[in-house]
Amino acid sequence: MSKQRIYEYAKDLNLKSKDVIDELKKMNVEVSNHMQALEPNEIKELDKKFKPGSSKDKQDNKAAQNNHKKHQNNNKDKNNNNNGGNAKKNNKKNHNNKNQKNNKNNKNNKNQKQAPKQEAVKEMPEKITYTEGITVGELAEKMNIESSNIVKKLFLLGIMANINQSLDDETVELIADDYGIEIEKEVVIDEEDLDIYFDDEEEDPDAIERPAVVTIMGHVDHGKTTLLDSIRNTHVTEGEAGGITQHIGAYQIENDGKKITFLDTPGHAAFTTMRARGAQVTDITILVVAADDGVMPQTIEAINHAKEADVPIIVAVNKVDKPTANPDRVMQELTEYGLFPEDWGGDTIFVPLSALSGDGIDDLLEMIVLVSEVQELKANPEKRAVGTVIEAELDKSRGPAASLLVQNGTLNVGDAIVVGNTYGRVRAMVNDAGKRVKSAGPSTPVEITGINDVPQAGDRFVTFSDEKQARRIGEARHEESIIQQRQESKNVSLDNLFEQMKQGEMKDLNIIIKGDVQGSVEALAASLMKIDVEGVNVRIIHTAVGAINESDVTLANASNGIIIGFNVRPDSGAKRAAEQENVDMRLHRVIYNVIEEIEAAMKGMLDPEYEEKVIGQAEVRQTFKVSKVGTIAGCYVTDGKITRNAGVRVIRDGIVVFEGQLDTLKRFKDDVKEVAQGYECGITIEKFNDIKVDDIIEAYEMVEIQR
């Protein structure tokens, strides 16, 4: 028996591929998708399930064939007896008998040939499945009817179509409904899209509780690394230059039998770089605020990042053991950003602690466990391993290495894996304690080697049973990423805003405002919120006082937003990042101009900006006055070139005396399009004849600024 794919088997029996896959799983057969080939023994087992009467039918057919043969033998015996009894009859009668016998045989033969035609008439199925773009011929075949019948139906509906015409979903539904057939559209699975392997954990009945993934964020020197150091009882801060976290790591601790995974991130990478690539890894955010310092600019940024990612926040009020500590002031300041303490009737958990002495750490861990229990975080360790890259590097001795966070399933040494646009086989696996491990379950951070290249932080990974499949998918994703890099970024800007609105791609215009003083920022934000254009809502996602920095650009890129600077400039890092990520930055000094520009962009009326570009200069050596023409300037091009369509200005003793357009440009008696440096020419200027010797004619053109 030849091999057959799952969907082909399902199609032959008018079944759903899902039903066949479910039955295979009951048979303990590992199934990746509907394209998997079936073994002969698997087909036999499926036949027993889906063709319960197949063996009985065969026996009935055999019995019918035997009866037919017996009937034919009896007829032959009777014919022989009759022939023996009538042997003495004349030849004419014999001849007639033969003709009659032949006629009977011919009739029998005709009936035998026509019988299969009656059997070939198939009944229309009650339900069919179809793929997008199905043709008339393919639909007719699935419905067991003639293609001409569908063509007639379409003609009556006012649709001219032939047998090879593709049909849209609505037309297929109309035809099927007319024949009383239920239809279902087959979903074509793109195996190169790793997102399809990230199942919704809540829908999995076999999912079990998993550890929470926690990110610690806050302002510089408020004690983020010291807090994490105190939690896991190690000394990272002492070995780091300037006390600043210099790498991304992930660490797992155990508290009262419950595991918690912490991401140690520089700045807000967990919420920006990863979220910009579509990854969501964090379950809970710990916002560290120093009790003696209060809310600072990076604290506000951290709040905005966490809210944008829709992640619950636990506020850790650090340094409460200092004499100048004022926890109540911190609570008061955070209420301005929507974080209301539980003691004041809000829903935000505040935990006072000292990262240095360790006071309050147990309370914080208890709150983390409590919040994670409320969230009901679950995963299925029996599934294929999927997750996200936390960090990656090229190690001199080990080659490409990647720190991964397993989000679902179990990752094992030897698994074939696709990580972002890279692929390979897990050669070795090390946990956060530096020990080699053979497997890692959900919410477990590990570092792996064995991939062919260095992936990016935030890339997703998926394991496969077949290394060839992993290689094929990895190579295809790599080629696709190269093509995408060559294409223009689709980040929103005021220039393409109206186009995206028309295509239905834009629902919210995310704006980040940076200004010189708080009053200006608040006034600008209030004015922008009043803009009312059908189709798009203005959404202020972050406001702050100070220069535009790299963090603002990263947030704008992650949120597909634009940055407005009011009386402030971007620093060098922000400029470079904005150019790399194609983030639109607008700098203004007048509030009215900001509102007018954004409103015009939303209405599709944003005028292009132009700048003047000087293309050449010519010195007037001699003048000629001609009736009906005016003054002709005999010139020598001293710099660049003079073109016929250029704008010109006449400069006399360093002062511009006239600005207008060229009328004619000639060399000898011929009209020319341009005259280059070092050549002489004749020039006349529209509506200006007061040209004098030694005047300088400067040519320029207006060039549109690329935004």
UniProtKB/Swiss-Prot annotation:
Residues 99-114 have a biased composition (Low complexity). GTP binds at residues 218-225, 264-268, 318-321. One of its GO terms (cellular component) is cytosol. Residues 264-267 are annotated as: G3. Keywords: Cytoplasm, GTP-binding, Initiation factor, Nucleotide-binding, Protein biosynthesis. It is found in: Cytoplasm. PROSITE patterns: G_TR_2, IF2. InterPro entries: EF-G-like_DII, IF2_II, IF2_N, P-loop_NTPase, Small_GTP-bd, T_Tr_GTP-bd_dom, TF_IF2_bacterial-like, TIF_IF2. Residues 89-98 have a biased composition (Basic residues). Residues 41-61 have a biased composition (Basic and acidic residues). It comes from the Bacteria. SUPFAM superfamilies: Initiation factor IF2/eIF5b, domain 3, P-loop containing nucleoside triphosphate hydrolases, Translation proteins. Residues 243-247 are annotated as: G2. Its main location: cytoplasm. Residues 209-378 form the tr-type G domain. Residues 32-125 are annotated as: Disordered. Residues 218-225 are annotated as: G1. Residues 354-356 are annotated as: G5. GO terms for molecular function: GTP binding; GTPase activity; translation initiation factor activity. Residues 318-321 are annotated as: G4. One of the essential components for the initiation of protein synthesis. Protects formylmethionyl-tRNA from spontaneous hydrolysis and promotes its binding to the 30S ribosomal subunits. Also involved in the hydrolysis of GTP during the formation of the 70S ribosomal complex. HAMAP family: IF_2_B. Belongs to the TRAFAC class translation factor GTPase superfamily. Classic translation factor GTPase family. IF-2 subfamily. This is Translation initiation factor IF-2. It comes from Staphylococcus carnosus (strain TM300). The lineage of its organism: Bacteria, Bacillati, Bacillota, Bacilli, Bacillales.
